[in-house]
Amino acid sequence: AVRSRAVSIGKALGLPATLLDTVADAAAWHDVGKVDPRFQAMLWDGDRMSADLAAEPLAKSGMPAADLTRRRRALRASGLPHRARHEAWSEAVVERYLADQDSPYEGDKELLLHLIASHHGHARPLLPPVHDSAEHDLEAIIHGKNVQAPLPREVPLSSADRFSRLNQRYGRWGLASLESVVRCADMTISAEGS
């Protein structure tokens, strides 16, 4: 749904096909990092067993947004580290997926990874540092392929260089506009309950 919405927005803005494909892929894969078992437990109201038994990973919790006490309790019970960002995990999974492919990504790989990492407004240029002592890998499925990626252990300072190159390539406002396509698609689909 988010991919389709991003395509609609991108077409309305007149994005060229190759750029539209990259934006669409970012929109499709922006939440793959939510497969982290701790994140799933948080979405399942802190219930790790329900999260482990679920047939599919959740993208959103069923908790009322206004019930902050319940949300905080679920967060504590999940074991997620303070300030953890699923965007970092999504970027790591997609980067591993692309590395495992037989041919290089046809679009702008740097833009793709940046749009995934920045879809909640962070990663401009860096995601916040998180101390995460967990030992598990992230396991996701993209296009029917199992992808296993290690948890990010540090803030990749190379993201700042990537951000600089993307600003040179697309311009400050151009890059911000591309980010807003993914963010707007995600937010509007979420608001509609899809």
Named regions from a protein language model:
Residues 1-5:
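Accessory helical-bundle/CTD segments and flexible terminal tails appended to RecA-like ATPase motors
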Residues 10, 14-194:
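Divalent metal-dependent catalytic cores for phosphoryl transfer on phosphate-bearing substrates
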